[in-house]
A protein has these predicted regions:
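Compact, glycine-rich, soluble single-domain proteins
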Residues: 3-84, 92, 96-98
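Well-ordered alpha/beta subsegment
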Residues: 80-81, 88-107, 112-115
Length: 115
């Protein structure tokens, strides 16, 4: 899980993510993400802005700063709606938000019959 490195209420809103992490998982500036805060159960959506590469920064801005504060552990997820297969990308990070492992994603389709 990533660690929040900064939390600022007096800002329009967003989450700043180390650009190296963004590149590793294919996040684009302005992309919508879900943020799940492991320390208090809060969940919110916001958009991504890049933080300096190699900084390890995960900063929460705006009203979401009420939900996630410095030191909180978070899971950040992005989704896409498409009729094409998209290979999910997942990484694990250490306490400094540096990638320690790329996780494989194995999905299995479950057929559903409609009457």
């Amino acid at each position: 899980m990533a660690r929040v490195t900064d939390s600022r209420l007096d800002y329009i809103g967003s989450i700043a993510i180390d650009e190296d992490l963004m590149d590793a998982i294919g996040l684009e500036p302005g992309e919508m993400v879900h943020v799940w805060v492991m320390d208090n159960g809060e969940r919110f959506q916001t958009y991504v802005i890049p933080a300096p590469p190699g900084s390890g920064e995960i900063a929460i801005y705006g009203s979401a700063a009420h939900k996630a504060q410095k030191g909180h552990r978070v899971i950040i997820a992005s989704t896409v709606f498409t009729d094409e297969w998209v290979e999910p990308k997942m990484v694990l990070v250490n306490e400094k938000n540096q990638i320690v492992q790329h996780l494989p994603f194995k999905a299995q389709a479950v057929p559903v019959e409609l009457s």
